[in-house]
Amino acid sequence: MLRIATCQMTSGPDTAANLQTAEMLIRRAAREGANLVVLPELFSLVTGSSEEVLKNAETYQDGPIQSVMSALARSLGIWIAAGTLPLKSPEPNHVTNSLLVYDAFGQEAARYDKVHLFSYEGTNERYDESELYTPGHKPVSFTIPLDNGTDVRVGLAVCYDLRFPQLFRLQSG
């Protein structure tokens, strides 16, 4: 049986504190029997400063956040869908908003870069994720083998992606 835990946390600009909270929640979920733990979007860093995001972006497959998530998955023997974190993008002054999945051996099982970036323009305010984030370009799913010999396929999406059913149609095909 697949037991999924979703972790709700209030992240801020202190990556170390965010990682400490995430680790505590992951360990609690594992103790309670979860074999897949899902962290929220931007679990590692929430700040209003694009400069801080760019400064703290990790190189893909090389960074402290990725190392911690991999080590936790391995030591606890569980799968972790690491929320999203900013990864360096080839596009100048941009990052990807990336969800990384680690298997129970700590190996990366999937990478999904958020495809649908949110934007809003109101009377007195404006927000556009594309000013900082490079969008992903493809649907991603992964398979978790269960103890009974069956597999469960899991499709990945982040926040605003939920408004686009075509993403899920592509994942199911």
Residue ranges: model-predicted function:
Residues 1-5:
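Extreme N-terminal starter segment of soluble prokaryotic enzymes
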Residues 17-28, 164-169:
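Short, acidic/polar
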